[in-house]
Amino acid sequence: MSNLYYYDGRESDINGFYDYDYDIICINTYLDDIDQKKVLYHEMGHVGQYLENYELMREKFETQANRNMIHHLLLDYIPSLDYIEDFNVCRFMDAYRLKTICDEQMVVNEFRNLI
């Protein structure tokens, strides 16, 4: 199981990262709660990936990590609904500041997989 560390990222453009060699996830402590959660879930998606080929398969690995993030955000969000029928993709995406069409499609697919 990966260890979690927080770092002072005020002077960095990096919100977080997974260090394969040490099996640790590092998160910028100056992110708000939503962004910390998004970064944590994204970086958890890199755990177990064969990162020695990262540069060759970067797009695939990042997409898988984003899907993992969305999956876990949905697991957090769905219990807050009174009825599963109340789920609204746009509201979910607004709540977690997700903006891309790719994110939207992943939300729809992951939601369908969960219900």
Question: Language model features by range: what are they?
Answer:
Residues M1-I115:
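Active-site hotspot residues in diverse enzymes, especially metal/ion-binding acidic/histidine motifs
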